[in-house]
Amino acid sequence: MSQISRDEVAHLARLARLALTETELDSFAGQLDAILTHVSQIQAVDVTGVQATDNPLKDVNVTRPDETVPCLTQRQVLDQAPDAVDGRFAVPQILGDEQ
């Protein structure tokens, strides 16, 4: 038995202000019915004794700690660039003026 009718899909489409063709209504009714069937199967799973969790992973922070290390200054980097203007790399324009 279908869990959602074609008329219910048409009603939902009207509420969402979607103009659906007859073919689309039939197609979406079938797709939504399949989705609802899958949801029903998941809801039927016995989870008695299973503790609820929002994240099954126990890893809290797997990144390295931040460390300040010496690096090049802005001037040292820009001195190696082919062209720099106002403390920034100068590169050829790739987009037109209309952008």
UniProtKB/Swiss-Prot annotation:
Keyword Transmembrane in record: no
> Which PANTHER family is this protein grouped with?
GLUTAMYL-TRNA(GLN) AMIDOTRANSFERASE SUBUNIT C, MITOCHONDRIAL (PTHR15004:SF0)
- Describe its partners and assembly state: Heterotrimer of A, B and C subunits.
Per the entry, what this protein does is: Allows the formation of correctly charged Asn-tRNA(Asn) or Gln-tRNA(Gln) through the transamidation of misacylated Asp-tRNA(Asn) or Glu-tRNA(Gln) in organisms which lack either or both of asparaginyl-tRNA or glutaminyl-tRNA synthetases. The reaction takes place in the presence of glutamine and ATP through an activated phospho-Asp-tRNA(Asn) or phospho-Glu-tRNA(Gln).
Q: Which GO terms describe its cellular component?
A: peptidoglycan-based cell wall
Q: Which family does it belong to?
A: Belongs to the GatC family.
An example Gene Ontology molecular-function term: asparaginyl-tRNA synthase (glutamine-hydrolyzing) activity
- Which SUPFAM superfamilies does the UniProt record give? Glu-tRNAGln amidotransferase C subunit
Organism name: Mycobacterium tuberculosis (strain ATCC 25618 / H37Rv)
- State the name under which the record lists this protein: Glutamyl-tRNA(Gln) amidotransferase subunit C
Alphabetized, the UniProt keywords read:
ATP-binding, Ligase, Nucleotide-binding, Protein biosynthesis
Q: What class of enzyme is it?
A: ligase
Write down the chemical reaction(s) this protein catalyses.
L-glutamyl-tRNA(Gln) + L-glutamine + ATP + H2O = L-glutaminyl-tRNA(Gln) + L-glutamate + ADP + phosphate + H(+); L-aspartyl-tRNA(Asn) + L-glutamine + ATP + H2O = L-asparaginyl-tRNA(Asn) + L-glutamate + ADP + phosphate + 2 H(+)
Q: Which NCBIfam families match?
A: gatC
